[in-house]
Amino acid sequence: MATFQEFIQQNEDRDGVRFSWNVWPSSRLEATRMVVPVASLFTPLKERPDLPPIQYEPVLCSRATCRAVLNPLCQVDYRAKLWACNFCYQRNQFPPTYAGISEVNQPAELLPQFSTIEYVVQRGPQMPLNFLYVVDTCMEDDDLQALKESLQMSLSLLPPTALVGLITFGRMVQVHELGCEGISKSYVFRGTKDLNAKQLQEMLGLTKPAAAQAGRGPQQPQVPPSNRFLQPVQKIDMNLTDLLGELQRDPWPVTQGKRPLRSLGVALSIAVGLLECTFPNTGARIMAFIGGPATQGPGMVVGDELKTPIRSWHDIEKDNAKFMKKATKHYEALANRAAANGHIIDIYACALDQTGLLEMKCCTNYTGGYMVMADSFNTSLFKQTFQRVFTKDVQGCFKMALAGTLEIKTSREIKISGAIGPCVSLNAKGPCVSENEMGTGGTSQWKICGLDPNTTLGFYFEVVNQHNAPIPQGGRGAIQYVTQYQHSSGQRRIRVTTIARNWADAQSQIQSIAASFDQEAAAILMARLAVYKAETEEGPDVLRWLDRQLIRLCQKFGDYHKEDPNSFRFSETFSLYPQFMFHLRRSPFLQVFNNSPDESTYYRHQFMRQDLTQSLIMVQPILYAYSFNGPPEPVLLDSSSILPDRILLMDTFFQILIYHGETVSQWRKAGYQDMPEYENFRHLLQAPVDDAQELLHTRFPMPRYIDTEHGGSQARFLLSKVNPSQTHNNMYAWGQESGAPILTDDVSLQVFMDHLKKLAVSSAA
């Protein structure tokens, strides 16, 4: 019999799903007492090398309000060629193509190992990939040159049939016509005036796709509308390479003490409108490359006077950010338009100061786009990250998927409360939609314009079965995730994942529910809720909510005697959860101190889309120690791990940091590694560097690489993350110093746990 841990791991590997609880309380009342809701982290396109796509279409339940897909949980009558839907119990006839099925000749979708299965939709046209580059020209020459080279490189990575367009902007916005031989032709727009799709259509002389197709005979293949602004790579490769090479810095003079006039809001608006007119409801990718904040027109986030800095958290709290609300509204409207048409907006912001990611966050968060933040386009961080957008799978297809929709079906005892992740609601009301919303709720379908194999969403459920209506012994609740998307090869695909979990009576079987708790998934699902709240609520309120939930969980599942904190015990399945909450409270997702609004936005954006493993690293970074005492080993994220004769490697997801202890640092400065008799020291110095390189080469987006030492200014990144078990207040209390004291007033994990136990066992709490 597999342990729960093995069961959880197998389910994640097979179906890309992790639940907070793997046995579900059987009534609404008991479920609310569990504190952590029944919820799942789901990775729709989790890579499965053993999952070949099936070349036929799924069989659907015939009930109009259900339409669930045939799956291994359905009961089948092979003789009568009927199947019963496991969600609504409707009996359905198999289609004629299934005439040959029997107990020994089952279709793949009925086999238990295919609880996740992928279908290729045979009907409909295959659409090419569309890329629209939106390029800022208000930047230093070396930055612009590096960006131009990256864009030219990207053309060689695109399939020959992919369509590419180019919009450049500074004080004006230029839409480049790419079909012209031998001449550069572009339409110039004022950067201060917004245009709607209809105005843009008339100005650029675009025809609506429907009108262009109307005169076509029924036998002719569907061709994309002729379009001078988006052309196949194979046709314009040379022209576009030359055009990019000739791009100059924005010619408008910038006087001393002023920022360049940058019309980012209008440029993005034109990009969204252009795709809206030419490729509605088709996957497309707007890639915006930004070297500074928008300083004029709709969407401006700061004025052009350099003496007036861009808004800080302090300004926002004091309601002193005069452009913020208007700019956010502008970008939110663009994000909704793009999402409605299945178009992705990526933002690559490379500048030393803020660029306005806070105001633009909807553009990426609503459309499943990438947000990348670096100091300059001339850094390996940007260049490598941009190249990884075009990563291919073993078949040579891009790993990106476009224009996705995700629908959830549930058995009648459970309803869907909402989703948290890079999606927008499709407002599909139905019998399985809960009235209590968590995240993006009130629907059972969401649009996810951009997906990759790591894109992960959190789904929150509500048990609706009444307390006095017991579920039969051995009953199971089921959930089906149906993801439809445009594969990068142009095919439409449908991936279906169907899972079931046992019900248990929380009064008589509380032990089996407690044993099924997945503390890692629960911590990240609660963290997503907290970060979602932090976008609209005050920081201290969110921390109080998180603390209250943790205390209630300890009271419900801890073992203790009333009023005796020393008696408190947590079972193994819960023991790490308080530690995750401790680190989450200190994380940049909930603490904005020392981070700009743009940095906080960037951190939260990444957290809301990554899978469980990466999310855990973000909440509680991993620390490895290298020393002469043995092979590299994981050590506690604690100040006691910082020893003079150790090298530490810390992975926070956003940074990879190598820290040399005091003694090691002195040896390195003395040059021992260059002496032949100290070759083992040279190997010790090299080991963490090799391990760091491996992480740097595989992660998206590429992390920042920091090499520091005891007393170095960048050691602050490590010191701010470790649990301060030794501080300047208690460093002499133990009689001898072990580890490095941290100069902080933050409470340590031990103090946090003592306080938590005291509150959990108190009758008043």
Curated annotation (Swiss-Prot):
UniProt keyword annotations, A-Z: Cytoplasm, Cytoplasmic vesicle, Endoplasmic reticulum, ER-Golgi transport, Membrane, Metal-binding, Protein transport, Transport, Zinc
InterPro entries, sorted: ADF-H/Gelsolin-like_dom_sf, Gelsolin-like_dom, Gelsolin-like_dom_sf, Sec23, Sec23/24_helical_dom, Sec23/24_helical_dom_sf, Sec23/24_trunk_dom, Sec23_24_beta_S
One of the record's GO cellular component terms: endoplasmic reticulum exit site
Main location as per UniProt: membrane
Subcellular location: Cytoplasmic vesicle, COPII-coated vesicle membrane; Endoplasmic reticulum membrane; Cytoplasm, Cytosol
Gene3D superfamilies: beta-sandwich domain of Sec23/24 (2.60.40.1670), Sec23/Sec24 helical domain (1.20.120.730), Severin (3.40.20.10), von Willebrand factor, type A domain (3.40.50.410), Zn-finger domain of Sec23/24 (2.30.30.380)
Mapped Gelsolin-like repeat ranges: 632-718
Keyword Thylakoid tagged: no
Binding site for Zn(2+): 61, 66, 85, 88
Family to which the UniProt record says this protein belongs: Belongs to the SEC23/SEC24 family. SEC23 subfamily.
Oligomeric and partner information: COPII is composed of at least five proteins: the Sec23/24 complex, the Sec13/31 complex and Sar1.
Protein name: Protein transport protein Sec23A
Record organism: Danio rerio
